Amino acid sequence: MNSQQEQTLKNQFIELTFNKEWRKKLDETPKSYRDAELIEYCLSKAWPDAIIYVRKKNSPSDSIILGKAEEIKQCLFDAITASAWGDDFDTWHDNMCSNTDFGMRYGVWQKFINMSFKYIYCINDKLNSRIRVDFNDCHIPLDDNTLLWCNNKGITDIKAWNDVTPDEYKRIRDGVHNEIENNSTVDNALQLEFLVWRIKKICDVLKNIKNLKDNLDGLETSISFFEDCGFDLENNSNVTAVLNQMDILKEYIAFSKFL
């Protein structure tokens, strides 16, 4: 991936996920924010992604995690700002994910850490003192979309990222890195996650378009049936409105080369 493509990915992600106030701040010269504020904001964005299942389950142990949110974020903030991984990012990452002080499972930790680095990857050049990390060492955030991609690639068959074990996670991590080594499109796992995320969005849209096309075909068949039975539908305002919308939708569908 060339530098222009990489920057486009970063800019699009910032545009989609950062609030208006922070998007404005990032364009300011001189900067009106401290590095710590921006890093804290990145972690605050990553946190909801990590605890989505925790909030849904709402068990007593998970409630403890929610109550310790600020302590957990501070723990990761301190590690990131100190570049605590040194020369061995994988070992540091494993130790962080294995931390049981706050009741966090390995799978939840990986999501929080990896999403935090995804945000930092996008804004590192906006910091006065950049985080000293080789982003090629970073891991892909495991979620429903990336696990589906890993399933399709034969890397793993697990379905729940929040319950991943350390051994399962390491197999996935290594499998993803092997895929990257054989892929000239991306340089690291974070770039791959951007593309997997986009591909999933495209697939969802195409699926909806396909369903829409099938539904329109069925609607046309039903209307033809009533007309064949002698019902006067042309003077029915509701039916006319539906037919007009069908014509518009057909134009959109015609643009799709995937159907």
Residue spans of the language-model regions?
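N-terminal interaction modules that seed assembly of large macromolecular complexes
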Residues: 21-74
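Charged, low-complexity interaction regions
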Residues: 211-214, 224-239
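Short, charge-rich amphipathic interface segments used for partner binding and complex assembly
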Residues: 232-259
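Short helix/strand-capping connector loops at secondary-structure junctions
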Residues: 158, 176, 221, 225-230
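Long amphipathic alpha-helices with heptad-repeat character
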Residues: 209-212, 216-219, 246-249
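C-terminal accessory module of base-excision DNA glycosylases/AP lyases that mediates lesion recognition
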Residues: 1-40, 90, 101-128, 132-210, ...
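Alpha-helical ds-nucleic-acid-binding substructure associated with the helix-hairpin-helix region
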Residues: 60-124
